[in-house]
A protein has these predicted regions:
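Solvent-exposed loop/turn segments at secondary-structure junctions
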Residues: 43-46, 70-73, 109-112, 150-154, ...
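The substrate-binding groove and active-site-proximal loops of carbohydrate-active enzymes
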Residues: 37-44, 81-82, 112-115, 188-192, ...
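C-terminal domain-boundary segment and adjacent tail
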Residues: 58, 167-180, 205, 209, ...
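Generic beta-sheet signal
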Residues: 36-38, 213-219
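Catalytic domains of cell-wall/extracellular-matrix polysaccharide-remodeling enzymes
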Residues: 48-51, 56, 112-205, 234
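Active-site beta->alpha N-cap acidic-glycine motif
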Residues: 32-102, 124, 129-148, 241, ...
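N-terminal export signals
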Residues: 2, 9-29
């Protein structure tokens, strides 16, 4: 099991520098931004999502929250042991969206689409989109970002989905090219099932030492919730440092794509 950092260790390790500020709402001086960071929160745990939104708002940022369309309807049916915490419903998702946070689909029932036939995979995505169309205010399927459960996809389902949505997130390398027109496939890294503080810090530090690009890190819950949780205190301090860097933008996926 990886070691959970305390505050002093994290501050020492992080060393991310400081100058400037960027917010998801203003997107000011984007010509100066060379590194984009998206923390993409999956599964929609109620307590974690509320706390995540509060931490992001503290720094004028918008969180990227991806929710399972049917989980709130029957919380007794768990995809696996890492989903054993209460999730939010669309009343919460609409509230967070109205506060400027990105709420996007993360499957209908958290099925691995590599393990079902193609037609069934399409049907599950359509069911997911139907729920979002009915429940999430202002949702436009063609402008949405679909986040695959388990970051599991294949060329056949990716080709079909590309015509349905603006972009999709799946497994692969952590670093994507800087956003460009028509960008569809986004890849990400993740870590778990233990606490991710150290891995996340190391991943970001390495990214910031390299050339321009877009880091997408798939996060889940906070503190004790979900697979590979991040400590809320660590997230708070991380965002404080990142927002002080002139060349860094911390953005949800859609605003990042808008930079193309």
């Amino acid at each position: 099991m990886n070691k959970i950092l305390n505050r002093r260790e994290a501050v020492k390790l992080l060393g991310l520098g400081a100058v400037g500020v960027v917010t998801g709402s203003s997107l000011m001086c984007q010509q100066e931004k060379t590194h984009i960071i998206t923390l993409s929160y999956d599964d929609g745990f109620e307590k974690s999502s509320i706390k995540t939104a509060e931490i992001y708002e503290k720094y004028g940022l918008s969180a990227c929250i991806n929710v399972i369309a049917s989980r709130h309807l029957d919380q007794s049916k768990l995809p696996d042991e890492y989903h054993a915490w209460p999730v939010g419903d669309f009343e919460l998702w609409n509230e967070l969206k109205s506060r400027g946070h990105e709420i996007m689909p993360h499957s209908y029932k958290h099925a691995n689409l590599n393990e079902v036939p193609f037609e069934e995979a399409k049907d599950l995505i359509r069911k997911c989109m139907d729920v979002f169309n009915d429940e999430l205010e202002g949702f436009v399927e063609e402008e949405s970002i679909y986040n695959f459960a388990y970051n599991a996809s294949n060329p056949e389902i990716e080709e079909w989905l590309s015509a349905q949505v603006r972009a999709f997130r799946t497994g692969g390398g952590a670093i994507n090219p800087f956003p460009y027109e028509g960008m569809k496939k986004l890849t990400c890294t993740s870590y778990g099932p233990d606490n991710i503080d150290k891995h996340l810090e190391e991943t970001i530090s390495k990214f910031l030492e390299g050339p321009s690009g877009w880091l997408i890190y798939n996060t889940h819950g906070l503190d004790d919730e979900g697979w590979g949780p991040v400590s809320s205190w660590f997230l708070d301090e991380l965002l404080e440092r990142l927002t002080e860097m002139k060349h860094v933008a911390v953005l949800p996926v859609a605003p990042a794509l808008d930079l193309a």
